[in-house]
Amino acid sequence: MSAIVARNLSKKYGGKPALDEVSFSIEPGRIVGLIGPNGAGKTTALKAILGLTAFEGELSVLGQDPRVARDKLMNEVCFIADVAILPRWIRVSQAIDFVEGVHPRFSRAKCEAFLARTKLHAKQRVREMSKGMIVQLHLALVMAIDAKVLVLDEPTLGLDIL
């Protein structure tokens, strides 16, 4: 079974197509990037996958229609928006504690292993971080959740090129 299947996925904004009968299939375990210019429909496709926007056509995420099974899918899907925000007062350790307390599939050990490869430390507050460091924290938190589908909108925005 494919993780995500779209058939003739369409969405218009003010009569202008953002997605025009797009079809694709993504198999489990695959990493897929959507590449295109601004306004090409990348974020609209991600919002459709998450059940955050109405669309025409067929879309199946883990065998479910995100329009009707959004709540159920959120147990299996993790998402970082391109404008994901953390409270400026929160410390790295507090963010980890929070996610550990609310998500049953979160692995503190995985998160700490990801963060060990960065310059972030447990007592550091978000207000002391660069944009790229905040992205690193978000990625560590989300990647440490045992999700079947990760949806990352502009996940490298603000990261340093290595």
Model feature map: region roles:
Residues 16-17, 71:
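Short coil-to-beta microelement around the adenine-binding A-loop and adjacent beta1/P-loop entry
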Residues 32-37:
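The feature captures the beta-strand-to-loop junction immediately N-terminal to the Walker
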Residues 51, 55-68, 72-73:
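Conserved ABC transporter NBD signature motif
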Residues 150-154, 159:
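Catalytic Walker B motif of ABC-type/P-loop ATPase nucleotide-binding domains
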